[in-house]
Amino acid sequence: MTRSLKKGPFVDHHLLAKAEKAVATKDKKPVKTWSRRSMVLPEFIGLTIAVHNGKQHVPVYVTDQMVGHKLGEFALTRTFKGHPADKKAKK
């Protein structure tokens, strides 16, 4: 179920303030955030946002195709190491 259009997109206020400050000062350092639930807005295009994945902050460069998606979609939380090898096949 998607969010109602009359409510608008959700973005944490502290993230929006940091992004506006970075745009105003033309700062190239990544904006560090733990807010994976925030939606990517058009104001974020061109910024690098460091999204926390539970262990570290993953730098995400925001492009125009990411607008409307959530930040957490671009910082994966699980690493797949592959299926364990079959012990019978080695013999």
From Swiss-Prot:
Alphabetized UniProt keyword annotations: Ribonucleoprotein, Ribosomal protein, RNA-binding, rRNA-binding
GO cellular component, one term: cytoplasm
InterPro entries xref list: Ribosomal_uS19, Ribosomal_uS19_bac-type, Ribosomal_uS19_CS, Ribosomal_uS19_SF
GO biological process: ribosomal small subunit assembly; translation
Record GO terms (molecular function): rRNA binding; structural constituent of ribosome
Pfam families, per database record: Ribosomal_S19
Function in brief: Protein S19 forms a complex with S13 that binds strongly to the 16S ribosomal RNA.
Family: Belongs to the universal ribosomal protein uS19 family.
Matches recorded under NCBIfam families: rpsS_bact
Annotated protein name in UniProt: Small ribosomal subunit protein uS19
Organism lineage string: Bacteria, Pseudomonadati, Pseudomonadota, Betaproteobacteria, Burkholderiales
Gene that encodes the chain: rpsS
